[in-house]
């Protein structure tokens, strides 16, 4: 959870190296080709080879094999599995049918399918088996995918995942929250609350904590109470909270009435850090677009896209655009979802490349084309495309998880340096960093011939200045702890005299330890701090946990946002808050449901 310093031997993927001892412990081997770990039991490839990922797969899928505990038994088991002699878990036909039904319900939830589509899946499987394996058609008799059963099973999976999260949360040394009130593109009445916690061995867990209905919790006090209730249920107190990541809406960051100020006030304690808040990670492109769209460009383009979807759908020149649109949110889309899709750098760049075709299309359907003769509007369009492309690149960098908060903050600082450079270049009319604007300016020069002012540099300097101020405001707290982030990202090169007084003795001792220096060189930072003795370095270890708990990416929020935009019509159907939370937990979690526990729970409820 720190910036990755320059090291002589370290590579980014060192944390993903297969360890031989995992074979007996978790029944996995290194695959013959590629990265990851190959499970000897189910032959599934576990792509992310971190020990916690391998362990979670084993605990969720193959708990049965824990009965082979002695070293000799374990070694014999591995050898049998290598030869394909699989000791089969003693599941009854009913239990196998229940596992299959649960797995299918989870898949339906992941794909955002409606409750009633389980019956269709059942019919498809029945037709397939009758034609291919007629002797096995009877196995479907125990698989129930009716709407009511599908709902119940999704809720059961949600409870199982939530219990796993709560069991881990009780051991969190520190945690942070991400509060997202902008994910719902169909209606703004839910707050998604995500948690990122760090366990005793610096194992990081990111998951959905709860969904809060803003219709029922309209006031900040009511929101605060709902969040506190969820934290209490998870066995967490505010004294362990280190950071808050939010959108920059007034509901979140209002100076006197925002939820952030309210939570920071409640979290004040002699034994905890001041809560670190930053509000620029979530929906960076979407929310920043409102600051840089100086001429309501996106609203105009939105009208064009609606026309294309209704009257130009068969035109070959627009097929790439329509395919891109449908891959994001399906064939049917509401106005707000379309508007949000247009506020992405990738989308605007594609539309800019089709502007000539769009002008011809608008002429053919009798729509106005006045914007294409408006010099100012065209320049604003080109500038918007370029600045949103730069924001897209930053957003992509912030979408990479497990890079640590300090590394993410490095990306922010680098972007701010770029903004300063953009300011100077615009002032000098140097459009090297603005290829779309340069293209528009060149076209206008060819059309006008005379030497006249094509674009106003001051206009775009003001936009860049506004963006700079917003970034400064959003990441103010990270600047406040920048020295701390640098210290724990590179402890062996940080001068002790610049460190806080409380940590100088430990830091000096750490830097003098040759063994620790060697470990630091060959391990990634997470592994290094996980192995650091809490008895010898209690302050460094404690702060390492806190730094590791800060959200380092917007990945989990983007995953939720993407899930909603792809399945907006399914999720717009009448759903209880409980069902909505279950769907989003299944869609965003990296945990595997405990299938054995779910089957056992089903048997106990249906003796």
UniProtKB/Swiss-Prot annotation:
<dbReference type="Pfam" id="PF18658">
    <property type="entry name" value="zf-C2H2_12"/>
</dbReference>
<keyword id="KW-0597">Phosphoprotein</keyword>
<dbReference type="GO" id="GO:0098554">
    <property type="term" value="C:cytoplasmic side of endoplasmic reticulum membrane"/>
</dbReference>
<dbReference type="GO" id="GO:0045725">
    <property type="term" value="P:positive regulation of glycogen biosynthetic process"/>
</dbReference>
<dbReference type="GO" id="GO:0005978">
    <property type="term" value="P:glycogen biosynthetic process"/>
</dbReference>
<dbReference type="GO" id="GO:0005634">
    <property type="term" value="C:nucleus"/>
</dbReference>
<dbReference type="GO" id="GO:0042802">
    <property type="term" value="F:identical protein binding"/>
</dbReference>
<keyword id="KW-0256">Endoplasmic reticulum</keyword>
<comment type="subunit">
    <text>Interacts with EPM2A.</text>
</comment>
<dbReference type="InterPro" id="IPR040647">
    <property type="entry name" value="SPIN-DOC_Znf-C2H2"/>
</dbReference>
<dbReference type="GO" id="GO:0032868">
    <property type="term" value="P:response to insulin"/>
</dbReference>
<feature type="modified residue" description="Phosphoserine">
    <location>
        <position position="146"/>
    </location>
</feature>
<protein>
    <recommendedName>
        <fullName>EPM2A-interacting protein 1</fullName>
    </recommendedName>
</protein>
């Amino acid at each position: 959870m720190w910036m990755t310093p320059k090291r002589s031997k370290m590579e980014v993927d060192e944390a993903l190296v297969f360890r031989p001892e995992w074979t007996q412990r978790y029944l996995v081997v290194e695959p013959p080709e590629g990265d990851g770990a190959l499970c000897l039991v189910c032959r599934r490839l576990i792509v992310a080879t971190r020990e916690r990922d391998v362990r979670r797969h084993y605990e969720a899928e193959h708990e049965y094999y824990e009965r082979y505990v002695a070293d000799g038994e374990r070694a014999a088991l591995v050898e049998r599995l290598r030869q394909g002699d699989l000791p089969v878990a003693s599941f009854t036909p009913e239990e196998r049918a229940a596992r299959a039904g649960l797995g299918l319900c989870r898949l339906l939830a992941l794909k955002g399918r409606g409750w009633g589509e389980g019956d269709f899946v059942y019919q498809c499987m029945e037709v397939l088996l009758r034609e291919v394996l007629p002797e096995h058609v009877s196995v479907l008799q125990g698989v129930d995918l009716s709407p009511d059963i599908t709902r119940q099973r999704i809720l059961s999976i949600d409870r199982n995942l939530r219990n796993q999260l709560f069991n881990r949360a009780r051991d969190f040394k520190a945690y942070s929250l991400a509060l997202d009130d902008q994910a719902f593109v169909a209606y703004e009445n839910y707050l998604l609350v995500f948690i990122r916690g760090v366990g005793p061995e610096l194992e990081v867990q990111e998951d959905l904590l709860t969904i809060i209905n803003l219709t029922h919790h309209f006031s900040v006090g009511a929101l605060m109470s709902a969040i506190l209730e969820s934290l209490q249920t998870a066995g967490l107190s505010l004294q362990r909270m280190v950071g808050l990541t939010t959108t920059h809406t007034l509901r979140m960051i209002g100076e006197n009435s925002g939820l952030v100020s309210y939570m920071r006030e409640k979290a004040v304690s002699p034994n905890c850090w001041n809560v670190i808040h930053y509000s620029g990670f979530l929906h960076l492109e979407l929310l920043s677009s409102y600051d840089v769209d100086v001429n309501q460009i996106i609203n105009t383009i939105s009208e064009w896209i609606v026309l294309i979807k209704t009257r130009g759908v068969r035109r070959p020149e627009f097929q790439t655009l329509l395919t891109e649109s449908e891959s994001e949110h399906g064939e049917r889309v509401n106005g707000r979802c379309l508007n949000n899709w247009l506020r992405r750098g990738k989308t605007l760049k594609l539309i800019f490349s089709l502007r000539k075709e769009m002008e011809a299309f608008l002429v053919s359907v009798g729509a106005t084309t006045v914007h294409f003769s408006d010099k100012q509007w065209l320049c604003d369009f080109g500038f918007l495309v370029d600045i949103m492309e730069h924001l897209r690149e930053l957003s992509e960098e912030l979408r990479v998880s497990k890079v640590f908060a300090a590394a993410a903050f490095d990306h922010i600082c680098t972007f701010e340096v770029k903004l300063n450079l953009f300011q100077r270049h615009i002032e000098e009319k140097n459009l090297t960093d603005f290829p779309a604007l340069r293209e528009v300016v060149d076209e206008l020069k060819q059309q006008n011939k005379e030497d006249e002012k094509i674009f106003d540099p001051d206009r775009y300097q003001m936009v860049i200045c506004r963006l700079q101020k917003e970034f400064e405001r959003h990441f103010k707290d990270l600047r406040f702890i920048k020295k701390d982030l640098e210290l724990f990202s590179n402890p062996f090169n940080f001068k002790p005299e610049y460190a806080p007084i409380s940590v100088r003795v430990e830091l000096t001792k750490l830097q003098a330890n040759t063994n620790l220096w060697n470990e630091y060189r060959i391990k990634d930072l997470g592994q290094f701090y996980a192995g650091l003795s809490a008895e010898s370095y209690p302050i460094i270890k404690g702060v390492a946990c806190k730094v590791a708990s800060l959200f380092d990416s917007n990945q989990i929020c983007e995953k939720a946002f993407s899930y909603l935009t792809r399945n907006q019509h399914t999720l717009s159907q009448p759903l209880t808050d409980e069902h909505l939370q279950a769907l989003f937990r299944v869609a965003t979690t990296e945990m595997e449901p405990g299938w054995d526990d779910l089957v056992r729970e089903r048997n106990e409820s249906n003796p």
